[in-house]
């Protein structure tokens, strides 16, 4: 990381700072480098999306559920007729 990279002030509880310091020492990094590594690792993993991103996604999900129910009901009716 270059000196001209953006700076960011970050407050954390003392116990978290101590854990970060211990982890950084164990990994042979500065606390800044360790914190950056933790953030990069977290951002590289896909995060689960909770809720709907917009109305179109919500509507698509509702329509999908309706279609599933229609297919299920149709198959159930067809099965009843064959037995």
Curated annotation (Swiss-Prot):
Top-level taxon in the UniProt lineage: Viruses
Listed SUPFAM superfamilies: Ribbon-helix-helix, Tetramerization domain of the Mnt repressor
A GO biological-process term: regulation of DNA-templated transcription
Molecular function in Gene Ontology: DNA binding
Pfam family, one: Repressor_Mnt
Keyword Transcription on entry: yes
Keywords: DNA-binding, Repressor, Transcription, Transcription regulation
UniProt keyword annotation of Transcription present: yes
Subunit field text: Binds DNA as a homotetramer.
Its biological purpose: Mnt acts as a transcriptional repressor of genes ant and arc.
Family: Belongs to the p22 arc/mnt family.
Protein name per UniProt: Regulatory protein mnt
């Amino acid at each position: 990381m270059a000196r001209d990279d953006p700076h960011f002030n970050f407050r954390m509880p003392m116990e978290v700072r101590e854990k970060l310091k211990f982890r950084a020492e164990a990994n042979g990094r500065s606390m800044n480098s360790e914190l950056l590594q933790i953030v990069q690792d977290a951002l590289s993993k896909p995060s689960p999306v909770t809720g709907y991103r917009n109305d179109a996604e919500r509507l698509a999900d509702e329509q999908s559920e309706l279609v599933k129910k229609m297919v299920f009901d149709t198959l159930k009716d067809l099965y009843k007729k064959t037995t």
